Each structure stands twice: as structure tokens, then as C-alpha cells.
Amino acid sequence: MPRTISLAVVPGDGIGPEVVHEALRVLREAVPADVSLDTTQYPFGAGHFLETGQILTDSDLAALAQHDAILLGAVGGDPRDARLAGGIIERGLLLKLRFAFDHYINLRPTALLPGVASPLAAPGQVDFVVVREGTEGPYAGNGGVLRRGTEHEIATEVSVNTAHGVERTVRFAFELAEKRDRKRVTLVHKTNVLTFAGSLWQRTVDRVAAEHPDVTVDYLHVDATMIFLVTDPSRFDVIVSDNLFGDIITDLAAAISGGIGLAASGNVNPTGAFPSMFEPVHGSAPDIAGQQKADPTAAILSVALLLDHLGLSEAAARVSAAVSDDLAARATGDAAPRSTAEVGDAILRALSTNH
């Protein structure tokens, strides 16, 4: 049956427009013949804020909510610009979108693909997914400051963990594990110190685990997890964690599997009540913007996540396979640097020729 995907595109700042351009080329090639792609571009980002004084208005949110999904490039301007201090763009755009659209799952697949160098001497088979809770924890904004600027200043950041928020994240992790070959869930927290929140997470995992007898479950403190990510990353299949620990885990996971230039992510509302957002993990890199030096692979892998989320799993697999082919070819072919467009061309060729 014919279908139209309504996609909001936010190229953003710096290298964002360049990598999104290549991602859209691949997306248009990958969608099945009976699927049409209707894209609407939005100017949000640091540049838009500096021009207009606005980051993301209520009317902007209402417009974005009408789409099936959002593809984001990267946002952020010159870090030396005082007008952008304090993470104003990240909080006013990315976090605002996450909370407004209830993106309670931050999904970060990690795989060491053939031809990709890892800083680890013997990484083994690296193929796991981090399921990070996206709307609670210390990022919920529950805190404050008293006596700022004095020797008696008090600053608090309260980590908010609700039974509802924890359970829906844990259930997503178990349902994902059921679809994977190894069917293993690892809860990562710090239950020996963060006893109240840790207990809620552990009790929830124990209860949901009883409904999934085919899934193996274990627990690691977050510090032990960081060690195992370096010494034995192949032990992991699905990691589930809170907002803060998940944020830290995913950056190290990217580092051991080729770097953030290959890392894709999804901020997901699994219910479909709001559009989910997909983006490369890397930043806007304003120092190389417009020079065709950025690798668009992470943005293209974000397209694979987007397709899978929209139920087009075969198209998603084709994109992932084409990226794998290109990465393998890079390792054995000409080592000369390629432009952003040349990487896009190569992945498009692999997609149309082999997949």
C-alpha cells in the first residue's frame, strides 16, 4: 500500500547541513518504491538563535509534532561566543524537544564493523545497544542555587526517577533483547551508593525479567561497566541505564567502536504519540564547516535507525549493509581522505549495487 513519510529536517549548524545532505540522498535511495518522502526543512540551531533571538517556540513545536520523524544534523556555534554560553542551544532545543515529545528512550547501537580500527588491542565481537532513559534523572532540571557567588553557595541537582519512567525504559530494553540473538540485558547503575534510585531500578528489572524467561539478566556498577567496556566489550548485548550513566556509557562505547564520527542515535517515543528524532552523535564542528571534511557516516546510520523505527526494517538493513561495505572498502582501498560528498557517493553506490 502506498505510504508517505513526513520528515522534519533540521540541518543545524556547522557540518550539520553537509552530513544531512548526504543522509537524505541515501534515505531517498533506500525507501521502497511504494514509499514517498515528504521533507520540510527547519532552520533551528545556534545560527537561527543569533539571527532571531529565538531557539524553539511553541508554534515550532506544534509544527514539528505533525511529522512522522525528525532528522537532525548537529547544533552549536563557536564555543567562544558568550551569547551561546551555558549550553543555551542544547537546553533550549535538544532537551526541550526531548521533554516536549517525551523521548524517553535514547537508543545508541554500538558495533565494531569490519575495517574499522578500535583503540582496543583485542576488542572481540562488539555488538551491543545502550538503552538510556531520556527524560528523567539529573537532567530533569530539578535543582537550584542558594547564595550564588559567596563562600556559602549551595548548588543542588536532584536525580528524578519515577516508577513509570523506569518501568517503560526497562520494558523497552527487554523487548529489544528478545529480538536479538544473545537475549541479554545488563542493568548499569550504582546501587551500593545511590540506594533509593538504584533500588527502584533493580526492583523494576527483577519484576520485568520474570516476564521474559528467555532473557539473561545481570547487573554491573557503572564504574565496573567502564572497565569492561575497555577490557571485554563483547560481554554486552543490551545495556539499560538511567539518563546520566547512559550518557557517559554511550560516549565510551562510541570511542571503542570507531569514534563518534560513526555513532548514530535515536531519541525515541516508542508509542508514536510524538515524532522521534534521529541524529549523529558528533557535534557541529564549526572549525571545518563548509570544507567537505566531515564524515557523513554517522548521519547515514541515523537514517538506518529512522527507517527501522518507522517499520521499514529491510530498508534499514540495506543502509547498514551499504555502510559496512564502504567501511570495509576504506580499510583495503586508497587511504587518501575523501570529501563528505565522496563518502556519500560511495555508500550510495554500495546501496544501489549490492543491496
UniProtKB/Swiss-Prot annotation:
<dbReference type="GO" id="GO:0000287">
    <property type="term" value="F:magnesium ion binding"/>
</dbReference>
<comment type="pathway">
    <text>Amino-acid biosynthesis; L-leucine biosynthesis; L-leucine from 3-methyl-2-oxobutanoate: step 3/4.</text>
</comment>
<feature type="binding site">
    <location>
        <position position="223"/>
    </location>
    <ligand>
        <name>Mg(2+)</name>
    </ligand>
</feature>
<dbReference type="InterPro" id="IPR023698">
    <property type="entry name" value="LeuB_actb"/>
</dbReference>
<feature type="binding site">
    <location>
        <position position="223"/>
    </location>
    <ligand>
        <name>substrate</name>
    </ligand>
</feature>
<keyword id="KW-0432">Leucine biosynthesis</keyword>
<feature type="site" description="Important for catalysis">
    <location>
        <position position="139"/>
    </location>
</feature>
<keyword id="KW-0460">Magnesium</keyword>
<protein>
    <recommendedName>
        <fullName>3-isopropylmalate dehydrogenase</fullName>
        <ecNumber>1.1.1.85</ecNumber>
    </recommendedName>
</protein>
<dbReference type="InterPro" id="IPR050501">
    <property type="entry name" value="ICDH/IPMDH"/>
</dbReference>
<dbReference type="GO" id="GO:0009098">
    <property type="term" value="P:L-leucine biosynthetic process"/>
</dbReference>
<feature type="binding site">
    <location>
        <position position="132"/>
    </location>
    <ligand>
        <name>substrate</name>
    </ligand>
</feature>
<comment type="similarity">
    <text>Belongs to the isocitrate and isopropylmalate dehydrogenases family. LeuB type 2 subfamily.</text>
</comment>
<keyword id="KW-0464">Manganese</keyword>
<dbReference type="GO" id="GO:0005737">
    <property type="term" value="C:cytoplasm"/>
</dbReference>
<feature type="binding site">
    <location>
        <position position="108"/>
    </location>
    <ligand>
        <name>substrate</name>
    </ligand>
</feature>
<dbReference type="InterPro" id="IPR019818">
    <property type="entry name" value="IsoCit/isopropylmalate_DH_CS"/>
</dbReference>
<comment type="subunit">
    <text>Homodimer.</text>
</comment>
<feature type="binding site">
    <location>
        <position position="251"/>
    </location>
    <ligand>
        <name>Mg(2+)</name>
    </ligand>
</feature>
<dbReference type="GO" id="GO:0051287">
    <property type="term" value="F:NAD binding"/>
</dbReference>
<keyword id="KW-0520">NAD</keyword>
<keyword id="KW-0963">Cytoplasm</keyword>
<feature type="binding site">
    <location>
        <position position="247"/>
    </location>
    <ligand>
        <name>Mg(2+)</name>
    </ligand>
</feature>
<dbReference type="Pfam" id="PF00180">
    <property type="entry name" value="Iso_dh"/>
</dbReference>
<keyword id="KW-0479">Metal-binding</keyword>
<comment type="function">
    <text>Catalyzes the oxidation of 3-carboxy-2-hydroxy-4-methylpentanoate (3-isopropylmalate) to 3-carboxy-4-methyl-2-oxopentanoate. The product decarboxylates to 4-methyl-2 oxopentanoate.</text>
</comment>
<feature type="site" description="Important for catalysis">
    <location>
        <position position="190"/>
    </location>
</feature>
<feature type="binding site">
    <location>
        <begin position="283"/>
        <end position="295"/>
    </location>
    <ligand>
        <name>NAD(+)</name>
    </ligand>
</feature>
<feature type="binding site">
    <location>
        <position position="98"/>
    </location>
    <ligand>
        <name>substrate</name>
    </ligand>
</feature>
<keyword id="KW-0560">Oxidoreductase</keyword>
<dbReference type="InterPro" id="IPR024084">
    <property type="entry name" value="IsoPropMal-DH-like_dom"/>
</dbReference>
<keyword id="KW-0100">Branched-chain amino acid biosynthesis</keyword>
<keyword id="KW-0028">Amino-acid biosynthesis</keyword>
<dbReference type="GO" id="GO:0003862">
    <property type="term" value="F:3-isopropylmalate dehydrogenase activity"/>
</dbReference>
